[in-house]
Each structure stands twice: as structure tokens, then as C-alpha cells.
């Protein structure tokens, strides 16, 4: 699939071969013509993300890769989508809105209240996590300056869990398995 995007700010300083997040999906710039960036999404990318549902003229979230030494805001986002979620609803809360997203277990297993999640490339703080869904608080600034203003119930979004949780799980898995084996051995001996 070929995606050509009028990028304006994201095009500044961007060259062919650079990585750019498109709705939270890390893609490589295949061509650049002024402010138009063209990307090619592989079949595997389309199977694992919501990019196939993009419509011509629709808004997307774009972000260039962070340069080493740059100001760090939000959380570590790689553009490696862990699953596709769906907008379940939104409701006002003061000046903000609470948005609820249905999410697969591949994302929810790393979700903790007050932790971080990436929704369509937007770093957001989790308000609550339940079986099958999570909520985030969306400020007016975020809604206005991202594609959230164009989303509604039932729309699909790309989700990326906080990578720190994935690394912690990977590092601890052998120890947890050894502990479980030891615990079973003790129970069998008793």
C-alpha cells in the first residue's frame, strides 16, 4: 500500500530513508517531494495495524524519530504496534474527556493505572484498566492537535504498550519459571 501524506511540519528536515511514525506505526520515507512524504506499507504491516482503514484526506498523526539529546516528553514509543484497539466511547470530565478503548490482551497485560500507552502515536496516561479495555484522559489540546477529533465510536486505532513492561517481563520470565518449578518441587515433597 502506498501512502502519500501532506506533512508540513513533519517534512522539515526529513529525508528519504528516515523513519516517521504514521498513526503510531514506524514507516520509512520512500519518497519526498516538498511537503509530501510517501511511504510503502508492507502486507505484514497492514495485517497488524489499522493503517488499511485510512481514508483519502483524513488526518493522521505524524512524528519524526527523536534525535539523541532531544527533550524527552511522554514515554518511549517505538512505532511497533502491539495490537489494534477500538474506540468504545468518550465522555466529558471537566475540561477534558475520558476515552475508553477496547484492547487486546497483548496490550492490556502491560497496562497499569497512571502508566503509559500509545494510541495512534499519541502518548497518553492510563486512567483505568479493566478486562478488555482501558481509559485515558484527553485534554482539549491533544484532541485539537491530533487525529482524535476525527475519531468516533467503533473506529480502529493502533496501540503500543509501554516497552519497559515488555523488557521487565522478558528479563524476569526465566526467574519466575525457576521459582514456579522450585515451588512445585517443595509442594510435591510435602
Predicted stretch roles:
Residues 1-190:
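Conserved loop->alpha-helix
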Amino acid at each position: 500500500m502506498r501512502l502519500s501524506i501532506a506533512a508540513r511540519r513533519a517534512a522539515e528536515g526529513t529525508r528519504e530513508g528516515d523513519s516517521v511514525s504514521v498513526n503510531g506505526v514506524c514507516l520509512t520515507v520512500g519518497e519526498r517531494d516538498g511537503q509530501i512524504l510517501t511511504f510503502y506499507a508492507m502486507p505484514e504491516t497492514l495485517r497488524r495495524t489499522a493503517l488499511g482503514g485510512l481514508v483519502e484526506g483524513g488526518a493522521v498523526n505524524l512524528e519524526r524519530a527523536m534525535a539523541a539529546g532531544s527533550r524527552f516528553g511522554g514515554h518511549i514509543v517505538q512505532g511497533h504496534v502491539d495490537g489494534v484497539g477500538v474506540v468504545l466511547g468518550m465522555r466529558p470530565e471537566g475540561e477534558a474527556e475520558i476515552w475508553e478503548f477496547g484492547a487486546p490482551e497483548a496490550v492490556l497485560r502491560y497496562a497499569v493505572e497512571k502508566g503509559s500507552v500509545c494510541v495512534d502515536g499519541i502518548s497518553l496516561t492510563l486512567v483505568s484498566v479493566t478486562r478488555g479495555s482501558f481509559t485515558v484522559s484527553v485534554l482539549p489540546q491533544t484532541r485539537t492537535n491530533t487525529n482524535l477529533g476525527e475519531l468516533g465510536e467503533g473506529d480502529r486505532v493502533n496501540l503500543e504498550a509501554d516497552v519497559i513492561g515488555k523488557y521487565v517481563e522478558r528479563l524476569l520470565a526465566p526467574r519466575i519459571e525457576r521459582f514456579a518449578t522450585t515451588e512445585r518441587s517443595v509442594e510435591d515433597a510435602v
